[in-house]
A protein has these predicted regions:
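Aromatic- and glycine-enriched glycan-recognition loops and surfaces
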Residues: 61-77, 100-120
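Aromatic-rich peripheral "rim/lid" segments of glycoside hydrolase catalytic domains that contact
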Residues: 2, 21-24, 39-47, 283-286, ...
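Glycoside hydrolase catalytic-domain groove-lining segments
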Residues: 106-108, 113-121, 128, 203-205, ...
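Substrate-binding cleft and catalytic face of glycoside hydrolase catalytic domains
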Residues: 39, 78-97, 109-182, 278, ...
């Protein structure tokens, strides 16, 4: 989810999550360049669905905060097996060629600390670094004037975190999130992926927005297709889980075909709904209405899991998001994306804790 949109506190944020299955990197000979793992392909009996939740950070010290451990325990108590962390750098303008840390960027030592904390809590980790616009706005609008300079800066940024992820033992890594303004440049992105593989030996994905994934040309360089699954499911407010489940049918048919074409499973690197009336009409929006809609949020969780669980091409979901930081400046908690303390959390506990068959 776009932190710039969060800071703006208004509509439109289409975002990120990720985690997945125990896939290893490819490459059979010692001299061969690492590549995607064949075990990520649809129908592989060893591949399992991810059960994950994102714990974002909005300030430098969030991940070293005393409450971080409590949040991780709460996430694990839902039956989740994975947590995603989102260190974020910023660029000042959409056409700029550089990015930098700010007071909102998680510190490296804090990130290492929280990865270790997650492991001690029994959770696997996906590291999903983000680039956002410092003054707010959609990161999909990043379209640098000098593409070559931007990709050079981006490669420095993303390989920094790839090396950190390798050293800290993170089990999965995302090479980018919702960068639709650059993601059609397949040659440059393939170079980025190769640079990441030189630093990180685990499975890789890219988190494309739901309206971006079809135009990404470098899926075959990665181990799993990542989609931030913010498809609108209704044209008016509804807490009818059956109706919402039916809305997934044409989407899942399209995704099954896309997975087959690319011989890759599809991970919902993000999916989520605010607890507001009308959330299912615009899942990407932080502010759909001022009216609470916890039942609609719960119905949307139920519908997604019912519609997708058991699909051989589906690699699972990392929900956006578990965000209870006292200083996050986000939408009031009762209206926010977090399922914590709401009926949606009960859905996760019921679905995820009932059994572990096919889960990672």
């Amino acid at each position: 989810m776009n932190a710039g949109r969060r800071a703006a506190g208004t509509l439109l944020a289409a975002a990120l999550l990720l985690a997945g299955c125990s896939f290893g990197p490819g490459g059979e000979g010692g001299e061969e360049e690492p590549g995607p793992s064949a075990s990520t392909r649809p129908g592989d009996g060893k591949a399992a669905g991810m059960r994950g939740i994102t714990l974002p950070s909005w300030n430098t010290g969030d991940y070293s905060s005393p409450v971080a451990a409590a949040y991780l325990r709460q996430i694990a108590a839902t039956g989740a097996r994975w947590v995603t962390f989102t260190p974020t750098w910023y660029q000042d303008g959409a056409a700029d060629a550089g990015m930098h840390t700010t007071g909102e960027t998680a510190g490296d030592d804090d990130l290492r600390h929280v990865i270790g904390l997650a492991h001690r809590t029994g959770l696997k980790v996906m590291l999903k670094p983000h680039v956002d616009l410092a003054k707010g706005g959609d990161r999909a609008g990043i379209r640098p004037r000098d593409a070559g300079a931007w990709f050079t800066a981006y490669e420095r940024f993303i390989t920094h975190y790839a090396k950190l992820a390798e050293g800290a033992g993170a089990e999965r890594f995302a090479v980018g999130t919702e960068l639709a303004g650059t993601s059609r440049d397949g040659a440059r992105w393939s170079k980025v992926v190769r640079a990441v593989r030189a630093q990180y030996r685990g499975p890789l994905t890219y988190a494309a927005n739901y309206d971006e994934y079809r135009t990404v040309p470098f899926w075959d360089d990665l181990d799993v297709i990542g989609i931030d699954a913010y498809w609108p499911l209704a044209d008016r407010p509804t807490a009818d889980a059956a109706r919402l489940r039916d809305a997934w049918k044409p989407i899942t048919q399209e995704l099954a075909a896309f997975s087959a074409r690319h011989h890759r499973r599809i991970l919902f690197t993000e999916a989520g709904y605010v607890s507001q009336r009308g959330a299912t009409t615009a899942p990407y929006s932080w502010t759909v209405s001022k009216s609470a809609g916890e039942d609609e949020q719960a119905a949307a969780y139920e519908a997604l899991l019912t519609a997708l669980d058991g699909k051989p091409w589906w690699a699972g979901v990392c929900w956006w998001m578990w965000d209870d930081w006292p200083d996050s400046g986000e939408t009031p908690r009762r209206l926010a994306y977090t399922p914590h303390g709401k009926p949606a959390e009960d859905v996760l506990r019921r679905r995820w804790r009932a059994g572990s068959t096919g889960a990672d």
